């Protein structure tokens, strides 16, 4: 598996495969949307004093808002930051903000892979939100409160639940051999190794 160590470590291979896939599918457009792994992003819902949109923008421009609300180990300038006001509460004089920070080095690396394949990245999003949007657009379910999205992959393993419009993301640690066992799991526990993985895997989901 040439991408076993991650897509970024197999740039040339992935670019060539993208070219081949686009040619085989006879896709003519070159504008594409790409998603980066959850592991390349910092996702938090933070509580802030209630502000208007103008006040929020001014606080962001001075860098004071994120420095006070989000303690990052690296310089803010090393991240591409997206934010969205989720809710405002006049009674408590607070508001909830979705904060998403992606390492610029990772953003540039994934963009370069796509560009090398002759494509033009026009939209970039974190994969968990891309999957959620695809789910929302594909399945017209009235009550989405009882639904969750689960991903097990080479780079990401997480569960995402949206409660009161707030995304709750739980990372799940799995060893490579455990991913293989779960990938083969068909609902019937056939051996003690599989049973052990399934039981441990289910614990963070409860």
Feature annotation, model-predicted:
Residues 1-206:
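Hydrophobic/aromatic-enriched cytosolic interaction surfaces used to assemble or bind macromolecules
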